[in-house]
Amino acid sequence: MHLRILGSAAGGRFPQWNCGCANCAGVRGNAGKNTGQHAFPGKARTQAQLALSADGISWFLAGASPDLASQIESTPALHPRARRDSPIAGVVLASADLDHVLGLLLLRELQPLRVYAAPSILRILREENSMFSMLNRADPQVIWTPIKSAAPFPLQDVAGNDLALCYELYPLGGRYPKYVRTKDLPPQDATSALFFTSKSVTSKTSKRIGYLPAVGKLDDALLSKLEGLDVLLLDGTFWSDDELSRLDPTAERAHQMGHISVEESLRLLKNINVRRRIYIHINNTNPILNEAGPEHRAVRDAGWEIAEDNWYLEL
């Protein structure tokens, strides 16, 4: 399986346009300067975005970030192969959060795609937001595909061809975005974990990736789902539960926003059997972005990696 991390920051990217915290001010000060001893020891990041493929030819996106256009341009594997073409076969959605779906509108140029999500997420996009009708100006353009079963589901292109890649939606619950007006949506579908499985034609072995950019808690059932993964990409939004409230007393705590803290997940997953453990969806205030800081060292010493834009993993 081929995995490309196109973006690794939480919503608002890093640096965030209206933030002057120590992290943002530091990385912003690096722009246009030669790296020196006074430079901020960290890297700018675009908003979290994955691309996955079984063969390195046809790709599926996990989410559709607001930075998607520039992320595609910086990734030659996702460039057109003909005058009007895209190797992107479709998109898999974990939620209706703006930083997870706005990039769909950047894919409106009449390119056939398949979009997979829980029925409630598709309902929000198709019935509550007229802008997304721009994705259905031609036939075929976007094929909206609801996933109701928790069983692994084969991903297909718009022609119905299986692409040797399966995925599974694992409901995490939580809350729907504040812009959602519909009140009768099932709470369990607000956020999902995404699990991808690929089988190699030559080795007959399966590879599994788990993508959880927003998870509020790690219960026993979820912990068992994570066991044995080849790659785990986990919610790294906040270092501590009170990260934002220490900066602004009126701000919510991490768990109230549906995010487990890195401090807590490090403890709970200390003995997890996962080949590679990577934190992603990192908020601009998170001290792990400072590569010289104790929090960054604590994560690395625990055997975890901290995702950066443009990483490529081949399993």
Model-predicted regions and their roles:
Residues G56-A117:
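Active-site metal-binding motif and surrounding structural segment of the metallo-beta-lactamase
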Residues H2, P112-R114, I143, C166, ...:
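Residues at the starts of beta-strands that form the adenosine-phosphate
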Residues P15, Q71-E73, L102-L104, R126-E127, ...:
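Short glycine-/acidic-enriched loop or helix-start segments at secondary-structure transitions
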Residues M1-A77, R81, P146-K225, W311-L315:
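Core dinuclear metal-dependent hydrolase active-site scaffold
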Residues D189, S200-R208, V215-Y312:
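Cap/insert and terminal regions of metallo-dependent hydrolase folds
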Residues R83-S86, L107-Q111, N136-A138, K225-E227, ...:
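Short, conserved loop/helix-junction motifs that constitute active-site signature segments
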Residues L107-S133, A138-W144:
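Long, hydrophobic, well-ordered secondary-structure blocks that form the structural core
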Residues L61-S65, P87-D99, A117-A118, I209-V215, ...:
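Active-site neighborhood of phospho(di)ester-bond hydrolases with catalytic His/Asp-centered motifs
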